[in-house]
């Protein structure tokens, strides 16, 4: 009789025990999923320190762990404490302070929210230096140049091998090159001369027998 009673109780309790185990498994899975995503949120203010409100297109927003230095970001709230979002990258505050201090004078709240942007001058690529010089800073003979306006009086900017330097304008009797003449083929010059000075022209030198030589010199017009 006792054996029959025990068998009956075990048969009755087995489904109940299985139901309790299934409920515990479901609860544990939900806890793990909730712990992985964090609590639901509507904005960053709903999350605790060190977290931000992360939103996906097809899921509800939840609190996610903040991102460390050199991680991608869309706003400063995404970055961990002590860092800010600069040019879409989490950056330590001490690395941005010189630029921020220099550009926030007289601009209250310029870096308060959103992504911190570097000034346009900081991001602008370094190009060629300005060639506008005052008269006192004009290039002297032998100094590098880009154009004749970079050189001082009586000088021109001419090619010297694979660079350009300031050279003296040619005087009367000096050998010259007649550049831009269509009748003769011109090869690339790696050693250019300046043009003849004012009142002079580059012409073939006349020899004693009044024949034109191949040598050209600066002569009076």
Curated annotation (Swiss-Prot):
Superkingdom as given in the UniProt entry: Eukaryota
Cystine bridges: 145-157, 151-166, 156-194, 176-202, 196-218
Keywords: Developmental protein, Disulfide bond, Secreted, Signal, Wnt signaling pathway
Keyword Signal: yes
Region span, DKK-type Cys-1: 41-90
Database matches in CDD domains: Dkk4_Cys1, Dkk4_Cys2
Compartment(s): Secreted
Entry keyword Cell membrane: no
UniProt-annotated stretches for the region DKK-type Cys-2: 145-218
Region (Disordered): 101-143
Biased composition (Polar residues): 128-139
Listed GO CC annotations: extracellular region
Signal peptide: 1-18
GO terms under biological process: negative regulation of hair follicle placode formation; negative regulation of Wnt signaling pathway; Wnt signaling pathway
Pfam families according to UniProt: Dickkopf_N, DIKK1-2-4_C-subdom1, DIKK1-2-4_C-subdom2
Domain topic, free-text comment: The C-terminal cysteine-rich domain mediates interaction with LRP5 and LRP6.
Cited function: Antagonizes canonical Wnt signaling by inhibiting LRP5/6 interaction with Wnt and by forming a ternary complex with the transmembrane protein KREMEN that promotes internalization of LRP5/6. DKKs play an important role in vertebrate development, where they locally inhibit Wnt regulated processes such as antero-posterior axial patterning, limb development, somitogenesis and eye formation. In the adult, Dkks are implicated in bone formation and bone disease, cancer and Alzheimer disease.
Family: Belongs to the dickkopf family.
PANTHER family: DICKKOPF-RELATED PROTEIN 4, DICKKOPF3-LIKE 3
Subunit structure: Interacts with LRP5 and LRP6.
Name of this protein: Dickkopf-related protein 4
Record organism: Mus musculus (Mouse)
Gene this protein is translated from: Dkk4
